Amino acid sequence: MSPQTETKAGVGFKAGVKEYKLTYYTPEYETKDTDILAAFRVTPQPGVPPEERGAAVAAESSTGTWTTVWTDGLTSLDRYKGRCYHIEPVPGEEDQFIAYVAYPLDLFEEGSVTNMFTSIVGNVFGFKALRALRLEDLRIPVAYVKTFQGPPHGIQVERDKLNKYGRPLLGCTIKPKLGLSAKNYGRAVYECLRGGLDFTKDDENVNSQPFMRWRDRFLFCAEAIYKSQAETGEIKGHYLNATAGTCEEMMKRAVFARELAVPIVMHDYLTGGFTANTSLSHYCRDNGLLLHIHRAMHAVIDRQKNHGMHFRVLAKALRMSGGDHIHAGTVVGKLEGERDITLGFVDLLRDDYIEKDRSRGIYFTQDWVSLPGVLPVASRGIHVWHMPALTEIFGDDSVLQFGGGTLGHPWGNAPGAVANRVALEACVKARNEGRDLAAEGGEIIREACKWSP
């Protein structure tokens, strides 16, 4: 047995500290179709060889610890250990490298994003031998994907439920996010839906505060949905935020939403947690509710370039845990992102099969097999003049989520919603006619304004 793959069972127990690379750095390893693969951006402490640090990440996120233990001899370390199988430099960064780690599938509980993250990122990020560590991407094998239900319904089923095809969906987050009474909140919902939006939305921190308890909000929003549907002849929805302090309370709110016969509820999946999110997703599938996901707290995890996790990892985790929509940032507006990178994880949310493409930040080919897709939500700081770019960049399978871009209209909420809908339909029509939205977008919208209701 080579020194890189030796186990304590094979050589006998010897107490003491041992270099990680002797056991966990295996450059000759050929990855298996059933392995979970991870790409870590590693910033080591000075003077530590990359092979040792990459092996340390593999060890501390799988079977290893800081010293040799005699109980290694009671199991097959070769079967269960993580392996650092490849190291590559990061262009333009002298003190960083990418460590590729393969984890055997037996290390993970079936259908549990919680367990997957607890194993891979739960402990190693505090490792003092590393200055910083970032999980850039994961390859989830088909064998593990098939243990997850995934989104409650997916893109096609949602379109069938709403009877809306051939264009992005339109939404608006009600503002001010905090302080409105339930009745005034419901009034704003009604005005936006009547004006032409498909959805309105609770802000992520609207739960059940003293100024507006959740049950009152649900009732007034349901009334707004019924009234706007009757007037427009279209199916409407409001993302009723079911996030709560306990899973039991969250489920109680989801049950009440179902009793009101509304089409969709919402969850803050990072602050609420993956276990709660998966439970809610299962309930939504069983009871015909769509599930909108907000990513509140994501920047705490993904903003730093050398530490934490990239959002593409959180997006993959959400597709496994379950959600029909998720906020995915945008490449215009006040939270502008890198276009190719953003579209890379948008494709990871929507498509069945995504090829490796490092220019878009995709480190591994990902096959989702039959797992339904998730609609990306473009939001934050967008307005009608962004519509040509949004239509061209995100395509039909997306939700364009306005806020001030609807409610800030000088004539009020309903005219703001009308402006959103007119601009969208004008851009979609022009695109379908073969016109260049990038060059003619402003003219297209100005022309549509002359004939708007």
Curated annotation (Swiss-Prot):
Post-translational modification: The disulfide bond which can form in the large chain dimeric partners within the hexadecamer appears to be associated with oxidative stress and protein turnover.
Origin superkingdom: Eukaryota
Localization (cell): Plastid, Chloroplast
Record keywords: Acetylation, Calvin cycle, Carbon dioxide fixation, Chloroplast, Disulfide bond, Lyase, Magnesium, Metal-binding, Methylation, Monooxygenase, Oxidoreductase, Photorespiration, Photosynthesis, Plastid
Active site: 175, 294
GO MF annotations, alphabetized: magnesium ion binding; monooxygenase activity; ribulose-bisphosphate carboxylase activity
Identification of the protein by name: Ribulose bisphosphate carboxylase large chain
Gene (UniProt): rbcL
